C-alpha cells in the first residue's frame, strides 16, 4: 500500500491516502472571522485540502458552506487547530463530521480538554456555550504536513494557551497563529486558564526570528511585509516585557476586557493597517 504515489508518510499522522489533483499552485484562503469567531484558513495543494482552525460552534453550518464554496465537490482531509480556545476550536467537530469525520489535530496538551468538552479551559463558558466533546489526534511540535507543492509545519507557540501552535508555510514565509496574536492592535491575554506571560514573550521572540512575510492573526486580514511584521511583533513584545517588569500586570489604566475577549485593548489605540473589507 505504501508504494502508492499518493501516500505521504508523516510522524504521528501516519500514511495518508490522497487522490491526485491537477497541478495547481498551493493556495491559502482566509475565511474571515465572523463575530466572536477566529479566522479559519483553508490551505489547498496538489495532495488535498487542510483547514486550520474552525471558529466557534455558532456559525459552524455556515462555515461548512463557505468551505464547500471554495473546494466544490472535494473534501477537506483534516483540521489543524492552533489551540483549544472556543473561538478557533468550537466548530471543529461539526465541520469534521460534515466532511466524513476527517481527523482533528491539536497539540497533546489540548487533547484532554477537547475530548471531555471542557467548557472552562476552552473558554466556551464565557460564551454561554457548551464545548462539543471532540475526538482529536496529536500533532507534534515541528511536525510537517505535506501538500505536494508545499507543506505546513507545526511550530510550538505557547503562552495564551499551553497547547498553542502556529502553522508555518515555509515557501510562502507565512504563519497562521490563532489566539497568540489576536490582531495587530490587540495584545493577547495571559490570564486565561493555562496562560503564561513568560511563554508569550518566548513565542514572540520565536516569531521575530522567523523573518516572516505574512502572519494570519486570530481576526482580520493577514499582516504582510517583513518590516511591518517586525514592527508589529516588536510593539507586542515590548508591551509584554513591560508587563513582566510590572509583576505580570497590564497597565492599570487599561479597561478590563470583556469576558469573551481573548485580548487586551490599549487605552491609546495601537496602529492598525489591516482593515477587513465588506
Language-model regions, residue ranges each:
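N-terminal amphipathic/basic-hydrophobic helices that include classical n-h-c signal peptides
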Residues: 1-24, 45
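Accessory terminal helices/loops
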Residues: 6-16, 201-214, 218-278
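Conserved beta-strand hairpin/beta-sheet module of binuclear metal-dependent hydrolase folds
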Residues: 18-71, 166-180
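Hydrophobic/aromatic beta-strand patches that form the interior of the parallel beta-sheet core
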Residues: 29, 80, 105, 137-139, ...
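Short catalytic-loop micro-motif centered on adjacent basic/acidic residues
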Residues: 50-53, 75-81, 154-156
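Metallo-beta-lactamase
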Residues: 56-58, 151-158, 162-244
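Active-site HxH/HxHxD metal-binding segment of metal-dependent hydrolases
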Residues: 58-61, 68-145, 235-243
Amino acid at each position: 500500500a505504501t508504494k502508492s504515489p499518493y501516500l505521504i508518510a508523516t510522524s504521528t499522522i501516519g500514511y495518508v491516502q490522497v487522490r491526485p489533483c491537477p497541478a495547481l499552485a498551493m493556495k491559502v484562503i482566509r475565511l474571515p472571522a465572523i463575530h466572536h469567531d477566529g479566522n479559519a484558513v483553508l490551505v489547498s495543494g496538489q495532495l488535498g485540502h487542510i483547514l486550520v482552525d474552525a471558529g466557534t460552534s455558532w456559525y459552524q453550518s455556515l462555515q461548512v458552506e463557505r468551505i464547500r464554496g471554495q473546494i466544490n465537490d472535494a473534501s477537506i482531509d483534516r483540521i489543524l487547530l492552533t489551540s483549544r480556545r472556543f473561538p478557533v476550536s468550537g466548530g471543529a467537530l461539526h465541520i469534521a463530521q460534515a466532511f466524513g469525520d476527517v481527523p482533528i489535530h491539536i497539540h497533546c496538551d489540548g487533547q484532554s480538554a477537547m475530548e471531555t468538552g471542557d467548557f472552562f479551559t476552552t473558554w466556551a463558558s464565557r460564551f454561554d456555550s457548551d464545548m462539543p466533546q471532540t475526538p482529536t489526534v496529536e500533532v507534534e511540535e515541528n511536525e510537517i504536513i505535506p501538500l505536494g507543492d508545499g507543506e505546513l509545519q507545526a511550530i510550538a507557540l505557547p503562552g495564551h494557551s499551553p497547547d498553542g501552535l502556529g502553522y508555518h508555510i515555509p515557501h510562502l514565509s507565512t504563519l497562521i497563529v490563532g489566539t497568540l496574536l489576536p490582531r495587530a492592535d490587540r495584545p493577547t491575554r495571559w490570564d486565561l486558564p493555562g496562560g503564561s506571560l513568560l511563554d508569550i514573550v518566548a513565542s514572540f521572540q520565536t516569531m521575530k526570528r522567523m523573518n516572516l512575510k505574512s502572519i494570519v492573526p486570530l481576526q482580520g486580514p493577514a499582516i504582510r511585509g517583513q518590516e511591518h511584521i517586525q514592527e508589529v511583533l516588536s510593539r507586542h513584545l515590548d508591551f509584554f516585557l513591560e508587563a513582566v517588569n510590572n509583576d505580570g500586570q497590564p497597565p492599570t489604566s487599561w479597561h478590563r476586557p470583556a469576558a469573551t475577549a481573548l485580548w487586551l485593548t490599549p487605552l491609546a489605540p495601537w496602529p492598525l493597517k489591516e482593515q477587513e473589507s465588506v
